[in-house]
Regions:
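Hydrophobic alpha-helical segments, chiefly the membrane-spanning helices
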Residues: 220-221
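Aromatic- and Gly/Pro-rich amphipathic surface segment
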Residues: 35-93
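A structural signal for short, well-ordered beta-strand segments and their strand-loop junctions
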Residues: 26-28, 63, 103-104, 129-132, ...
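Short, structured coil segments at secondary-structure junctions
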Residues: 57-59, 124, 204
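Thiolate-centered catalytic microenvironments shared by cysteine-dependent enzyme domains
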Residues: 4, 74-175, 196
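Flexible, polar/low-complexity N-terminal or interdomain linker segments that lie immediately upstream
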Residues: 1-50, 135-203
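Terminal peptide-recognition signature
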Residues: 15, 61, 120, 208
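Conserved small/polar residues in nucleotide/adenosyl-binding loops
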Residues: 209-214
């Protein structure tokens, strides 16, 4: 299978050869969800992955705290996208921007690194890639790690917002009977089928197709 955007994914062997490249900046995006399935009004507690980062990370990597620094914490929902000015400043302050090639990775799942990839895309920054397999694959291959914390100097970030990256519920609702739109549920099948009440109201958006994406990604599909 050929990827439409092959530059969006890099392999561990490639990154190993870039560790001394000053134009490559690496970020651990790990976030941990502690599910509280008996409390549907609060389906999970969020924990930063910083403690895991301190134990082991790719040499030179800095850490990004998704909930604290890259979300709208005035929202009642976790991980709500902040306004573009705030987000651009957060990226810039953490060293993300010109002229650097940014590598995002996470532990125990790709969804955290892909979230940062999408947010950077939303602001128009294109020099970004995701480490295929994350740090789990890096460690499986026996590649070097370290435990000291790292940070990068701020970078120049000129945002050019792409409003087609994220949409609101009104847009989704209006697209439900639009033959040119496809809705895909990337959550596990038990949530799609309404067999798991984790998020309070079981089930899915009508007319939705599930791709079992979580299983496919975990299995390399």
């Amino acid at each position: 299978m050929e990827f439409k955007y092959p530059e969006a994914i890099v392999e561990c062997d490639w990154l190993l050869n870039q560790l001394n490249n000053d134009n490559v900046r690496i970020y651990d995006c790990t976030t941990i969800l502690h599910y509280t399935d008996d409390h549907p009004d609060k389906p999970y507690d969020v924990e930063s992955g910083y403690e895991l980062y301190k134990k082991s990370h790719i040499p030179g990597a800095s850490f990004l705290n998704l909930q604290n620094d890259f979300s709208n914490n005035d929202s009642k929902f976790k991980f709500t996208l902040p306004n573009s000015d705030y987000l651009a400043e957060a990226f810039q302050n953490h060293g993300i921007g010109e002229p650097f090639h940014i590598i995002f990775y996470s532990r125990n799942g790709m969804q955290w690194s892909t979230r940062f990839w999408w947010m950077a895309q939303y602001l128009g920054y294109k020099k970004i890639s995701i480490l295929n397999g994350g740090i789990n694959e890096w460690e499986r291959l026996g590649m070097p790690t370290e435990s000291k914390s790292n940070s990068y100097k701020s970078a120049k970030f000129d945002a050019s917002v792409n409003d087609r990256i994220f949409v609101d519920k009104e847009y989704v609702h209006s697209s439900m009977n639009d033959d040119s739109s496809i809705l895909i549920n990337a959550l596990p099948e038990d949530l799609h089928r309404g067999q798991n009440p984790r998020y309070g109201r079981p089930g899915r958006i009508c007319l939705l197709y599930t791709s079992d994406a979580a299983d496919e990604v975990a299995g390399g599909g």
